[in-house]
Each structure stands twice: as structure tokens, then as C-alpha cells.
């Protein structure tokens, strides 16, 4: 019965991912916490779930020429070492057994859910500002130090994703949209997904090595979600985008506030 429930949960989140493009960490990790899984297990399992579900999308975007591998490399040069360093710290048993361990993870999750919801609220404004409304000196500064800024943002993403499993989607795309304002939306999304795969995989392996991944749970979630993502993407043209976005924002804000203050 529990296995069936996990398959249905995977299908629900997978359908949401296909429908909206958001939901891997933002919905799956809170759902696993509601099922009663400890925060490290929920985050670790979701990270490997995200790596597997995003891999197909990365391949698809690469085939269409929608991945800038130079940007992926710059982001990964910052994010992956940070993830490994954080896991080296977490692997200290005395810290894992302290009351602050789970509290740090749930607080990080709550903050990132609020950040993701805020980005969704202002997504159109961010896109408009990135192309039309930024001061010339700001554009010049960003362009001149773009590689350094991208590397620095990789450091930030590595920390956020490792601590919360959230951030590789909407947050990462918003960062890229700001830095690379002349790049097409399709290439921004493809590049963001391509970077998310190695980051979530490495971060997930760190949790797995500490015993914080439930492989049976992971398998059942994938059984439900992989076909559901395809169905959700097909249904996305039939459902008003505004309605979906508003429901998602309310849900993410509510969960974010809850996990930030419990």
C-alpha cells in the first residue's frame, strides 16, 4: 500500500513538473516531509530523483542546441566543489547527531521555497528588466565580469541545492536570465537543466554515502513520475498558465513559511 502511495505521489509531482516546469525539489521534498521522512532522507532522495528526471530533459535540450556548455562549466566549477565541501562537513557524525542538523535543512528548504515563489511572482518583470530596463553601466559591468559572476552564482546554487534540494530550477534560471540577458529563453532553460543534472547527482551521492537516501522510495517515485511528466507536458497547452502559476505560488509560499518557522 505504501509503495502504491509513493507511485501516486511521484505521478502527481511528475505531472506538475510537466505542466509547469517547476516542482522537482519545490514539491517533492515537502511532500516527503509530510509523509514523515526525516529532512536529510527527503532531501537526499529528492536530489537523486531530480538528477534522473532532469537527465532526459538535458539530453533533449542538447539535441536542439539549447545548452551553452561553457556556462554549464562555469556554474559547475562553483557549485560542485561547494556541494562536496558541504557534505564533508555534514559527514562529521557529531554534527549529524546534533539537533541543529535537521533544523538547518528544514529552514534552508523553507527559505528556498519562499525565494522560488517570489521569483515566480516577478518572473515576467525579471525577464523584462533583463532585456530592456537595466542601466547601461550595469550591463557593461555584468558583461565585463560575466564569467566571474557566473562562477560566483554557481557557488550560491551549490550551497542552496545541497542544503535544501531547491534552487536548480526557477532560481537558477532567474540568475542566468539576469546575467545572460541576450540569450534566448529556450537556451536559458536548457542550460539551467544541464547544470542541474551533475549538481543534483553529486549532492545526492553525498547524502547516499551518509545513508540518507531511501532507494526503494526513489524507485517508486520514478515509476510514477517518468510517464506523468510526459503527460503533464502534453496537457500544459490545455490549462491556463496564469491559473497554474497562481496555485503554485500560493502552495510554495505556504510551505516555505511553514518550514521556515517550524
Give the ranges of each region predicted by the language model.
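Residue positions within transmembrane alpha-helices of multi-pass solute transporters
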Residues: 23-24, 55, 81, 85, ...
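Interfacial segments of multi-pass membrane proteins
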Residues: 28-41, 171-187
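Alpha-helical transmembrane segments of multipass membrane proteins
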Residues: 14-15, 31, 58-59, 158-159, ...
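Juxtamembrane transmembrane-helix boundary motif
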Residues: 1-9, 35, 63-163, 178, ...
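Transmembrane alpha-helix boundary and packing residues in multipass membrane permease domains
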Residues: 30, 46, 87-88, 170, ...
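Transmembrane helix-bundle signature of multi-pass membrane transporters/permeases
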Residues: 43-51, 76, 80, 189-197, ...
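Juxtamembrane transmembrane-helix termini in multi-pass membrane transport proteins
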Residues: 14, 20-72
Amino acid at each position: 500500500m505504501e509503495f502504491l502511495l509513493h507511485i501516486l505521489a511521484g505521478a502527481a509531482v511528475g505531472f506538475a513538473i510537466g505542466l509547469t516546469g517547476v516542482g522537482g525539489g519545490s514539491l517533492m521534498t515537502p511532500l516527503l516531509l509530510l509523509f514523515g521522512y526525516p529532512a536529510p532522507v527527503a532531501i537526499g532522495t529528492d536530489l537523486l530523483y531530480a538528477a534522473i528526471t532532469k537527465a532526459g530533459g538535458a539530453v533533449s535540450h542538447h539535441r536542439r542546441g539549447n545548452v551553452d556548455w561553457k556556462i554549464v562549466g562555469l556554474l559547475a566549477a562553483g557549485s560542485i566543489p561547494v556541494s562536496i565541501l558541504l557534505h564533508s562537513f555534514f559527514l562529521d557524525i557529531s554534527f549529524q547527531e546534533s539537533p541543529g542538523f535537521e533544523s538547518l535543512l528544514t529552514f534552508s528548504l523553507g527559505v528556498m521555497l519562499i525565494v522560488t515563489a517570489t521569483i515566480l511572482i516577478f518572473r515576467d518583470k525579471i525577464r523584462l528588466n533583463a532585456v530592456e530596463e537595466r542601466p547601461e553601466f550595469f550591463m557593461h559591468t555584468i558583461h565585463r565580469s560575466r564569467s566571474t559572476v557566473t562562477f560566483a552564482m554557481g557557488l550560491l546554487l551549490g550551497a542552496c541545492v545541497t542544503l535544501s534540494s531547491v534552487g536548480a530550477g526557477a532560481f537558477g534560471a532567474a540568475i542566468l536570465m539576469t546575467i545572460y540577458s541576450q540569450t534566448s529563453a529556450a537556451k536559458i532553460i536548457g542550460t539551467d537543466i544541464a547544470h542541474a543534472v551533475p549538481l543534483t547527482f553529486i549532492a545526492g551521492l553525498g547524502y547516499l554515502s551518509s545513508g540518507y537516501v531511501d532507494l526503494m522510495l526513489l524507485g517508486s517515485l520514478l515509476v510514477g513520475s517518468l510517464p506523468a511528466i510526459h503527460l503533464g507536458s502534453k496537457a500544459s497547452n490545455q490549462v491556463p498558465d496564469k491559473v497554474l502559476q497562481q496555485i503554485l505560488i500560493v502552495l510554495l509560499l505556504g510551505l516555505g513559511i511553514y518550514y521556515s518557522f517550524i
